[in-house]
Amino acid sequence: MILRPIRPEDEPLEREMFTTFSERTQRFRFFQLIGDITHDMLIRYTQIDYDREIAIIAEHTDSEEKKRMLGVVRLISDPYNETAEFAIVVGDPWHGQGLGSIFADMILDIARERGITKITAHVLKDNFIMKHIFEKRGFTIKGDEDMWYAELDL
């Protein structure tokens, strides 16, 4: 497995990864069910402005040389690169293998290198895996009846 920035030519890998998402994974990442991912969405997710956003993918090449995207972490900053929001999604076949934690640690390091001073994230209240990731890294977590709001000063 390699971790690397996403590229425009990763659109087919992103589309294929999306097909591995259960309804639960879709709801946790997008706060709704998407159905089929559109070409416009794929463009938005693979052709990014690296001055304000970064997306790191986990790519695996199997024994038959087929590449797969296992997951992606995104960091989107404000125009001043002071505060940024991050999100993680991992394809269902690769849940429970520590990839979310690897992504979280990596994106926090990248945020620090960029001089970002605050990281935020919003997740649904039943996304206990992400809540655990936040707690383990020292995020302040607040909630309402539907969402967890996490913040970390870097």
Named regions from a protein language model:
Residues 1-154:
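Long, contiguous binding/interaction regions
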